[in-house]
Structure formats: structure tokens, C-alpha cells
């Protein structure tokens, strides 16, 4: 009888020990769904200089899994943001504090390595996480699927989830230096800086004990596509930061200060895009494997975690629709189509907002430069409402209890937005156009001074 039960056990093979991959492993573990994680690297949590922002839409899912408290202990809530411009003008906003008050989850930043450590250390059965296994082949076998690794190992299951990122013909218009620095006098924990330059931006988050997480995004000379996108070395990161060392990002803090105090830094090309195909037979992809975005709005990891919540919920529902038999390939395909139908538009909306954010922050046109400098601070209410409305529509795992914080947060009046990112910004652009209509000379003057 035990052998019969084992024969009918549905198994998920997760390719990639990423944040998305390990979060899915935790979700499946909570549902008692058999699974393994195959990771190509020798260790799950290497220090690569990257960091992530955790927003309420990602935090609520990690909280459902019992992981958020460990993460929160390593962070300082962001409560205030400062924005600065090339002409030394600046202003501040308490939008992060408002988000914290609304959702009971703050915006926080921490090392990607630390997030992976928390996910790994809190995972209940580490024998399910297999490292040093680079996938070389995927086989579809009709009633099952197999993953073959470079050393000849074969792992057989019923569903393969790609959570390790892929290289494909996505566009590359920006390069980014990610860095983590020691405390810098003048940068206070719980604050965050956006410096909008011409064709570049510098964004910092100041975490627990003064640890500074930062990135510099530089617009490239042209649009590239993989595999022709530039590749960068540590020397390239040093060269870019050296050229920008005197750029003042806030008060008397410069890019040079970030670089001199760095603990680790790396440089990479930023791929942007969202795929139309999310699954094939028994194979499905999520997170960075299906949508890639710039870090400007801090939603890359959070969007991946939402993918996990929806996919795990659907897998669990499908399996329990018939407890005696494994789901057929047809059932699996139907489930994966539903996964895409539920996640495609939200992910696309986030991708579009991220894409716009990169171009807005780097002032890649004179109109964006003018709106950022002269209009942006006066439409804070619009930005706040749009942000809260978007976050309030975040997905959760449907077979786990909703966190208590969600029930006490004041977000019930906000429903998932049906508007596109372009429509969400209509008021911003209308305000800007009105400015030029009332002051016709302003457009030509600013165009000549900014260009």
C-alpha cells in the first residue's frame, strides 16, 4: 500500500535555488507536496554584491511562510526618501512611512545573500536542495518529465519549474553598478535617496546599523540584445564610479563616498522584457525566468514571490481535486494556463512601471527631466494612491492563513487597479502639458538648457 501511495505522489522539480525557487520550495513544503531544488552553484547564498528591496506585496507572502520575522530583524524600515537633481534642488517625501502605516509592512532593503540564507536555514528538509548540479537537458516523457545534469544525474518528476533566470533576446539599454557600503556619516538608517542625473541615476537605501545599499544606473550608447549585450568586470565598475566620484547625491554626500566605503560591488547589463510563453507541457517558468526589469521601483523579487504564491496555490488545488490519482498532462497544462492568465497582466504592469521608472529617473528626455524637476513633487497624492492601490492587489498563498498584519492594515478600500501604468500617469503628464500651454516659452527654454 505504501508503494502504491508513493507511485501516485506528485513531484515538482525546481530548477534554481534563487529567491523564487526557495520560496516555492517553502510553499510546497507547507502543502506537503513532494519536490526538490536543483542548484548549479556550489553554495546557495554566495555574496555577489546584490541586494533586494522587500515591499508589502512580497512581505505578506514571506510572513505566511513564517519567514518574515527573521528577515525583519536584519533590517531598518525605510520611512523617508530624499530626491535630488543636477541643479542642487532637492525635496523629501514620507511616502515610505505612509506605506508602512497602511500595510503594517515597511519597505526594507538587505543583502540578497541574507535573504537566501534565511530561506535556506529555515527550510525543513535540506536534503531536498541539491547543489553543484547544472542542468544540461530536460526530457518530456509523456506521463512525466526529467531533468538531466552535466554529471549524468537524472531527476524525474511531474512538473519542472524554471526559477534560475534565462538568457534570451531581451533588450538592454542600461548598465548598473550594485554596491553595499559601510556606514557613511550623513546617511541615516531608515532613509533613502534618489538622485536623478542626466542619463544616469543613483539610488541608495540606508539599512540597519547604517549599512548602505546602493545602485547606479547608466544609460548605454545604444540598445543591445542578448548575446551582444556588454559584459562588465570589476574594473568597469571602478571606472564608472571614478568618473562619477564628484557627483553630489544629497547634501555633501558623493558617489565617491559610496565607492570608498564599499564592502562589495559589481556591474551588470540590465535586461528588460516579459515573455509571452510561460509554459510548455510540464514545464513552467517564473520570476526572472519570465520577466526581467530594472531595480528602479524595487519590485523584481517581490513580483517573483507573487508568481510563487499563485503557482503554489494552483498546484495545491490541482492535486487535491483528485487525491487518488496524479493529475494528467492535460490537467497540468490547464493549470499552467490559469497561472499565466492570473499573473501575466500584473507582472506586465509592474514591468512597464519599472521600465518607465528607469527612464524617468535617468531623465532620458527633456520632458521627463522637466516633469521630475518641476512637477513631480506636487503630485505626491497621485503617486501615493497609485502605489498603495497597486500593492493592495498583491497575491497571497490561498491555502495558508492571511497574516495578522494584513487584517490590521488600512488597505481594504484599495482594490487591484485595472488601469494601465500609462493611464495611471495621465494626470502627471496633463499637469506638465498645462504648464507649457500657460507658459509657451518655458518648453523651448528648458529644452535648450537641458539638452
UniProtKB/Swiss-Prot annotation:
EC number(s) from the headed UniProt entry: 1.-.-.-
Transmembrane annotation, as ranges: 426-446
Gene3D superfamilies reported for this sequence: FAD/NAD(P)-binding domain (3.50.50.60)
Membrane topology term: Single-pass membrane protein
Binding residue positions for FAD: 39, 53, 112, 288, 301
Catalytic residues (positions): 196
List of glycosylated residues: 385
Subcellular compartments: Membrane
InterPro entries: FAD-bd, FAD/NAD-bd_sf, FAD_mOase_fung
Co-factor requirement: FAD
Pathway, per record: Secondary metabolite biosynthesis; terpenoid biosynthesis
SUPFAM superfamilies: FAD/NAD(P)-binding domain
Any one GO cellular component localisation term in the record: membrane
A GO biological-process term: terpenoid biosynthetic process
Molecular function GO terms recorded: FAD binding; monooxygenase activity
Keywords of the record: FAD, Flavoprotein, Glycoprotein, Membrane, Monooxygenase, Oxidoreductase, Transmembrane, Transmembrane helix
Family note: Belongs to the paxM FAD-dependent monooxygenase family.
Its biological purpose: FAD-dependent monooxygenase; part of the gene cluster that mediates the biosynthesis of andrastins, meroterpenoid compounds that exhibit inhibitory activity against ras farnesyltransferase, suggesting that they could be promising leads for antitumor agents. The first step of the pathway is the synthesis of 3,5-dimethylorsellinic acid (DMOA) by the polyketide synthase adrD via condensation of one acetyl-CoA starter unit with 3 malonyl-CoA units and 2 methylations. DMAO is then converted to farnesyl-DMAO by the prenyltransferase adrG.
Protein name, per record: FAD-dependent monooxygenase adrH
High-level lineage: Eukaryota, Fungi, Dikarya, Ascomycota, Pezizomycotina
